[in-house]
Amino acid sequence: AACESGGASCFTTGIDPGFANDLFPMTLMGLCSEVRRVRASELLDYTNYEGDYEFEMGIGREPDYRPLLENSDILVFAWGATVPMIAYAAGIELDSITTTWDKWVTPTERTTVKGVIEPGRVAAVRFTINGIYRGETRIQLEHVNRIGRDAAPDWPSGDSDDVYRVDIEGTPSIFQET
């Protein structure tokens, strides 16, 4: 709205937005004559990641710690622009954008490049940014970040440690992991 009222545009690039959650699915959508749903997932094992996942995601922290990304406004600020962009490419105008946030507490000790995560601490997080159209989630960006491939075993995972996945329900339906 600010750009529109000021007669300006906003250009962002990088991984997110910039390829994995927007250009990758939209490129695959170009193969479809109809797109009903799109899910773009980032499924990563952070065991060897040296960045700040404690403050941002709460990994390694106590379960009651509220990390930065647990705030819905922050998730929408960081990833929200991608959701309506994909919706536009699918030919729909979203009614709303929602988010989810889940954490998984490890029952065992987990060793990372940054140290040890003790039992009873968060060792995986899953969050989504969802484009809602006529009461249904039609566009979804999903992130699952874990310490060890066996963490949060009921959550989505890829065939290798780090996966970018696109799942399009349409004509034809497309499933791609990179």
Language-model features and meaning:
Residues 1-46:
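A contiguous active-site-proximal alpha/beta segment in oxidoreductase catalytic domains
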Residues 2-4, 58-63, 170-171:
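Short amphipathic alpha-helical segments, especially helix-boundary/capping motifs
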Residues 158-178:
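A hydrophobic, small-residue-rich beta->alpha segment in the mid-to-C-terminal subdomain
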Residues 7-13, 69-71, 178:
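A short glycine/serine-rich beta->alpha loop
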Residues 29-162:
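Active-site-lining helix/loop region of Rossmann-like oxidoreductase modules
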Residues 25, 96-99, 170-172:
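Low-complexity, compositionally biased segments
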